[in-house]
Regions:
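Short beta-strand-to-loop acidic/aromatic patch adjacent to the donor-nucleotide binding site
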Residues: 1-11
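Short, high-confidence coil segments that cap the C-terminus of an alpha-helix
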Residues: 1-3, 31-33, 137
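A secondary-structure boundary/capping signal
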Residues: 9-11, 39, 106, 153
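Conserved core of the sugar-phosphate nucleotidyltransferase
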Residues: 16-116
Length: 170
C-alpha cells in the first residue's frame, strides 16, 4: 500500500472543487509528508477573528506549524482599530491563512493516525489535525485560491444553497 492515498472531505465543505482534489493528489505524491491539506489566504478581519474559520501557520517549506480557531499568528501591538488601521492593506501585505477541511493521506500515515488517542490540543481546539502535529507527523499546506463554502452555522446553509442554485445544482 505504499502508493495508496486516502482522501477525506469534511461534510461541512460541500462544494470543494475537483481541481483542488487533483492539486492535493499531486502534492502528496511528490512529498515526504504524511498528509496534505489545502489552505487559503485570509483577506479580511472578519474571517481572521471568526472561530469557525480555522487558521493555520506554516513554515516556508509548507509544513503546518499549528492550527487554531483563535487568530494566529497573534499581531502584537495592533488592536485592529478600524479608525486608524488599513485592514485591507494589512491582509494583502501579510500572509494569513485559513484551512479547508480536505485531507490527502498516505495510507500508512492514516493507519498510524487512526491508532493515536485524542491529543491535548486536539481536545482544546476540536481540531483533529492537531493530533498529527502533536505526534510528530508532518502536514503539507497546499495554498489554493479556491474559496470553499463551509457550512459551520445555520446561516451558512442558505448561503450555500444560493451558491448551489447559481451553479445549477439542485
Amino acid at each position: 500500500f505504499n502508493s495508496v492515498y486516502i482522501f477525506t472531505l469534511q461534510g461541512d465543505e460541500p462544494l470543494v472543487s475537483p481541481n483542488l482534489i487533483d492539486s492535493l493528489a499531486e502534492a502528496i505524491q511528490n512529498s515526504d509528508f504524511d498528509c496534505a491539506t489545502p489552505i487559503i489566504r485570509i483577506y479580511n478581519l472578519t474571517e481572521y477573528l471568526n472561530p469557525n474559520f480555522v487558521k493555520v501557520t506554516k513554515s516556508i517549506t509548507g509544513k503546518a506549524l499549528y492550527f487554531s480557531r483563535s487568530p494566529i499568528p497573534y499581531v502584537r501591538g495592533n488592536s485592529f482599530d478600524v479608525g486608524n488601521f488599513d485592514c485591507e492593506k494589512f491582509f494583502i501585505e501579510n500572509n494569513f491563512y485559513s484551512h479547508i477541511g480536505l485531507y490527502a493521506y498516505k495510507y500508512k500515515s492514516l493507519e498510524k493516525f487512526s491508532l493515536l488517542p485524542e491529543s491535548n490540543y486536539e481536545h482544546y481546539e476540536a481540531l483533529e489535525q492537531l493530533r498529527m502535529l502533536e505526534n510528530g507527523m508532518n502536514l503539507l499546506c497546499v495554498e489554493t485560491t479556491h474559496k470553499a463554502c463551509a457550512v459551520d452555522v445555520p446561516s451558512d446553509v442558505s448561503k450555500t444553497e444560493e451558491i448551489m442554485k447559481k451553479m445549477g445544482i439542485k
